[in-house]
Amino acid sequence: MGIQGGSVLFGLLLILAVFCHSGHSLQCYSCPNPTADCKTAVNCSSGFDACLITKAGLRVYNQCWKFEHCTFNEVTTRLKESELTYHCCKKDLCNINEQLENGGTSLSEKTVLLLVTPFLAAAWSLHP
C-alpha cells in the first residue's frame, strides 16, 4: 500500500469517524420535583448536552439541559424562578448539590468576566 492507498484508508477512517458515534449520551441527575437530595440518574435525550443544577430558595432542580440555554435569563424563564443560583456542566453526573455549595460559579459570571476584560484592557491602553 503506497501513498495513495494510505490516503484512501485515511479518507475511509475520516468518513467513519464523522458518520459514526459512540452512542453515549450524557448522564445527569434528574428529579421531576425540586428536591435537595436528587439521586436519580438518567440518560439525557438527544440535544441535551449539559446537566443543570439550580437552587431557588429551598428548591433544588436537577435536570438535563441544553448548554446553549445555560444563561441566567433562560434558566429563570424556563424554571419560572426570579432569584436563583445555577451551575451547568458537561460531564456525567456532574450536577450535584456540592457544585452550588462549594462556590461553583455560574456561566453568567464567567461570561461577564470575559466581556469586561477586553474593555478594561482597552481602557488601560488609552490611559496616558
UniProtKB/Swiss-Prot annotation:
Any one Gene Ontology molecular-function term assigned to this protein's record: complement binding
PTM characteristics: N- and O-glycosylated.
Record localization: Cell membrane; Secreted
Pfam families: CD59
GO CC terms of this entry: external side of plasma membrane
Keywords noted in UniProt: Cell membrane, Disulfide bond, Glycoprotein, GPI-anchor, Lipoprotein, Membrane, Secreted, Signal
Disulfide-linked positions: C28-C51, C31-C38, C44-C64, C70-C88, C89-C94
Propeptide: 103-128
Domain of life according to the entry: Eukaryota
Protein name as annotated: CD59 glycoprotein
Species, as recorded: Pongo abelii (Sumatran orangutan)
